[in-house]
Regions:
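Long, contiguous alpha-helical bundle segments
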Residues: 2-181, 185-201
């Protein structure tokens, strides 16, 4: 029984040390003025990007009559699309440092995927290119904040960025554009909630 008690005590100490090691940077900065300014500025920026994505979703709906995900699930299975992961940005098991890394990587991935939307909607080039630029700028903001916190932020050269997905038919291209925007909207919603969570600490 004594050994069990000692083992549990040791586990508690190690767990506390692990949390201190990995949670301290953001926790200590939660009340920092510059960090809070970063959060609020990029909350507004993320909200603006979400609005632009929603505008393009309406264009896809009006132009191609692709409006409901449920009707397109079977086609989605055959599309060459990947969804960046944000599991560390949900409230349960939230890890700010890892979440920042996932947001940064995901934004870069969607910046490339939006190239397919640009090809799909040439008459809306200005809006799509603005969305790509804003996505790149938000990614850069996250990267800079990671560097300010002393966290690793690996940025591959521009020539190594993923090209937009290629589709085998015009219909696949249309459905692909629909899901790129729908998935990006969900990604941004999760990123927004994560930034808002940090702003409220």
């Amino acid at each position: 029984m004594c050994c069990l008690t000692q083992a549990l005590a040791l586990a508690a100490v190690l767990s506390a040390a692990w949390r201190a090691l990995h949670g301290a940077p953001v926790a200590e900065l939660s009340g920092d003025h510059d960090f809070q300014l970063f959060l609020h500025k990029n909350l507004e920026f993320t909200r603006k990007i979400r609005g632009d994505v929603a505008a393009l979703q309406r264009v896809v709906c009006d132009t191609f009559q692709l409006c409901a995900e449920e009707e397109l699930r079977l086609v989605q299975q055959d599309l060459p699309l990947t969804q960046p992961r944000l599991e560390q940005c949900h409230s349960r098991g939230f890890q700010a440092e890892v979440c920042f890394g996932q947001i940064h990587a995901g934004l870069r991935a969607y910046q490339g995927s939006l190239g397919a939307v640009l090809l799909l909607l040439p008459e809306h080039t200005a809006l799509v290119e603005t969305l790509q630029l804003d996505t790149a700028n938000l990614s850069s903001n996250i990267q800079q904040q990671m560097e300010d916190l002393g966290l690793d932020a690996v940025t591959p050269p521009a020539e190594q960025r993923s090209p937009p997905p290629a589709f085998s038919s015009r219909f696949q291209q249309q459905v692909g554009g629909f899901f790129i925007l729908a998935n990006f909207q969900r990604f941004l919603e999760t990123a927004y909630r994560a930034l808002r969570h940090l702003a409220r600490l």
